[in-house]
A protein has these predicted regions:
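N-terminal, active-site-proximal structural segment of metallo-dependent hydrolase catalytic domains
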Residues: 2-157, 331-333
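Soluble catalytic domains of enzymes that build or remodel membrane lipids, polysaccharides, and related
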Residues: 116, 122-135, 144-333
């Protein structure tokens, strides 16, 4: 009698525990997939949407991690519909991780070689480190962001002999920016923004090249619209003259996974890092997550240029790595 009454109780408890674990696993997977789906859906819809989507889009490749974790939960829970959901998300992420934009070599004859370096020196703190890198690497054009008054004075004192031509926007904190050049420069209006974005026209061995420094505001939660507007102004500047060779370089505070940045590429500009096979190399935050970060510093070039090598150079005293690329300018066919 005692044995007969005990058996159903033991059987019922044993059957309930696996079902609870499966429901828990399926719930965890659904939460992970739902979050990833929002970001991937915005990427597919070509929109940066609202916070927190722009911030998460910067790290889109790393969404593979929660997606893979969710897929593991679905397998443990034997939730096959969820497994299909996870596989679809993995496929979409793999598709979007591929390089965006045009590639290919120019068709005209080569006419000039030049090296371009861009660096965000974080409120001028890395000015001395930048001077060392510039002296070692000897770029022809240097785009410097967040170069406040002390930084500007340092660059004038240390680099004027090697870079006699400059175009700058003076400012404190993050507002100052400067373009240094071995080639003669003629200043242009630049692009209006909260932080300085000077522009110039360079005479590169007798060939006209448009130069524009990029430094739009970052997509902080309270200023996503401002970030989009300033990237839009850079897009308009890029589209204003597609026939003249152009270099647009700086801290864009955006990756290829942001719709506002892709619209700049859609004007015909190409990312030199992508052309040289380094399109996903992180540049920020270089001090805290150097291998898990995002590529937000770029050298964009028009179809007149070929990029042979692009390197990401860590600098002390700043949270951005510098980007150095070797370019060949080709004449129109």
């Amino acid at each position: 009698m005692d044995t007969a009454t005990a058996d159903p109780t033991v059987t019922g408890a044993g059957a309930g525990r696996p079902g609870g674990r499966r429901r828990f696993g399926a719930g965890c997977a659904a939460l992970l997939f739902a979050g990833v789906s929002v970001v991937v859906g915005c990427r597919a819809a070509d929109t940066d949407a609202i916070t927190p989507v722009p911030q998460l889009l910067a790290f889109l490749p790393w969404l593979l991690v929660p997606t893979a974790a969710g897929l593991l939960f679905t397998l443990l829970a034997r939730w096959w519909t969820g497994a299909v959901w996870g596989v679809v998300l993995l496929g979409l992420l793999a598709w979007f991780i591929e390089p965006y934009g045009k590639a290919g070599d120019p068709v005209g004859p080569p006419v000039a070689e030049l090296r371009v370096l861009t660096s965000n020196v974080q409120f001028g703190r890395a000015a001395d480190a930048l001077v060392d890198v510039v002296r070692r690497e000897e770029p022809d054009l240097v785009f410097v962001q967040e170069c406040e008054y002390t930084c500007d004075a340092t660059l004038k004192r240390e680099l004027t002999d090697a870079y006699p031509y400059r175009q700058s926007v003076a400012g404190g904190g993050s507002e100052g920016s400067v373009i240094l050049s071995r080639f003669p420069l003629r200043g242009t209006a630049g692009v209006p923004g909260t932080m300085g974005m000077p522009g110039a026209v360079a005479d590169v061995d007798g060939h006209t090249v448009r130069l524009q420094l990029a430094h739009p505001m970052p997509p902080l939660p309270e200023q996503v619209r401002l970030w989009q507007r300033e990237l839009g102004r850079l897009r308009d500047a890029a589209a204003a003259d597609r026939d003249t060779p152009t270099v647009l370089a700086g801290d864009f505070n955006a990756t290829q996974d942001h719709a506002a940045f892709r619209r700049i590429l859609d004007t015909g500009l190409r990312d030199a890092a992508r052309l040289a096979g380094a399109d996903r190399t992180p540049t920020w935050p270089s001090r805290t997550l150097p291998t898990l970060g995002a590529q937000i510093d770029h050298v964009l070039v028009s179809e007149h240029f070929a990029a042979h090598r692009t390197r990401v150079l860590p600098l002390p005293d700043t949270d951005h790595s510098a980007v150095l690329t070797n370019l060949t300018l080709h004449a129109a066919p």
